[in-house]
Amino acid sequence: KETAAAKFRRQHMDSGSSSSSNSNYCNQMMKRRRMTHGRCKPVNTFVHESLADVKAVCSQKNITCKNGQPNCYQSNSTMNITDCRETGSSKYPNCAYKTSQKQKYITVACEGNPYVPVHFDGSVLLPATSTQAQAPLARGQ
């Protein structure tokens, strides 16, 4: 059976490539990575950074996951990612996706030993602050 870490790599890692010039990238990759089997996965993100860089996020900024779990981490820097989103005309088995290339901070959930990403929790343009009520000059202390 596919481990959670292997599933994360299959669904979210595409190191050393980018989708920049290819509007068909998501249609090809979603199929190739088996996310259109049985149904169309509505939204998926591919990360175009090294696996080592993405694994390193597990030791970066600890934040709460969208589902309330405490084991999410946000990257210290932006990463080159591609968002794939199902189009309105997409109908299984002919899944169709819109490809959007972005530079964003990513959030992943990590678990296991070694501690590795097992779930992609989202991406943001601006990093989360550890506490919302932080004084503006509290950085770098």
UniProtKB/Swiss-Prot annotation:
Glycans are attached at residues 62, 129. One of its GO terms (cellular component) is extracellular region. CDD domains: RNase_A_canonical. Its EC number is 3.1.27.-. GO terms for biological process: defense response to Gram-positive bacterium. Keywords: Disulfide bond, Endonuclease, Glycoprotein, Hydrolase, Nuclease, Secreted. Residues 1-25 are annotated as: Disordered. PROSITE patterns: RNASE_PANCREATIC. The active site is at 12 (proton acceptor), 119 (proton donor). Substrate binds at residues 7, 10, 41-45, 66, 85. It holds the Pfam family RnaseA. Belongs to the pancreatic ribonuclease family. This is Brain ribonuclease. It comes from Giraffa camelopardalis. The gene is BRN.
